[in-house]
Amino acid sequence: MKTDIANHLLKIKAVFLRPNEPFTWASGILSPIYCDNRLTLSYPEVRDDIASGLAGLIQDKFPGAEMIAGTATAGIPHAALAADRLSLPMCYVRSKPKAHGKGNQIEGAVVKGQKVVVIEDLISTGGSVLEAAAALTEAGCEVLGVAAIFTYGLPKAAAAFSEAGVEYHTLTDYDTLTEAALAGGYITEQDAAKLKEWKADPESKSWMN
């Protein structure tokens, strides 16, 4: 499954690998990879495999789930598709409460004590999805964990999830994608070495040499 999803992301160009022309993240980090999982929605086969994968992941890792929550906005469609396959209720969590109306941060019929799994499309540092999990906890839900399509596998994210005490699982990851890209001829051995070096220390620029 991990390799299949990685190949999907590479084929539809949801993931770009540019070891020699790095992208600049909002945080200022120079990165050899850019991931846009929103593109997966435009490809029915890919979208279906992701929905089935997330549903299976939740059944396997979080069998007690009673509600699926999507992070706004990228996690919403994937949460809806997975919830449909699992025949479970679904809600979504805004990054902050609305400035008008009822001022909701969580949209949907959420019941206190409900066991919830949060779906995110991409995990970089983990900040946004952990904020969503915190909002659900504050609303009285029991957050079982997080399911996502892809993770960069950065140490900072692992530390953040550990500190928050939140379990997380993904359909594929950075290492699997790098291996698939090399096997598929998307990158060279030299590129793969740069990608590995970047992951070890994303804030360093030594991998660019």
Curated annotation (Swiss-Prot):
The UniProt gene name for this protein comes to pyrE
Which keywords appear in this protein's UniProt record, sorted alphabetically? Glycosyltransferase, Magnesium, Pyrimidine biosynthesis, Transferase
Q: Report what the protein is called.
A: Orotate phosphoribosyltransferase
Provide the binding site for 5-phospho-alpha-D-ribose 1-diphosphate.
94, 98, 100, 120-128
InterPro entries this protein is in?
OPRT, Or_phspho_trans_dom, PRibTrfase_dom, PRTase-like
In the record, biological process GO terms are: 'de novo' UMP biosynthetic process; pyrimidine nucleobase biosynthetic process
Catalytic function, reaction form: orotidine 5'-phosphate + diphosphate = orotate + 5-phospho-alpha-D-ribose 1-diphosphate
On assembly, the entry states: Homodimer.
